[in-house]
Amino acid sequence: MNYKKTNTYKSFLKSKYYCLKHTNYFDIYDDLFEKYRNKKITFVEIGIFSGGSLFMWRNYFGKKARIIGIDLNPESKKFEKYGFEIFIGDQSKKSFWKKFFKKIGKVDVVLDDGGHTNYQQV
């Protein structure tokens, strides 16, 4: 499939901030996430960098979706003013996840685009 025809790509183009995404994933995202579009879901992205992906996912999933971002950088909290929930923490720490899930509850989709070292991914 041509990634430019995907709903993910269309949402990517609408992002309010810089969004770094590899287009070769867009077909996969559409295949996996299409069933969640325009539904009341909780979506969590680990690693939000400049925040653009939050807007991309908001465009993709629709207004019913609860979009949550996790990052190490405290400056990421600035995106809360746009209706996103932002948590600052280290994805490699069990203590972070324990607190996170206690507060958040059930999550429908988790996308890990955070740390790229072995200890952060295992």
Region locations from a protein language model:
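A short alpha-helical cap/connector motif
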Residues: 1-111, 115-122
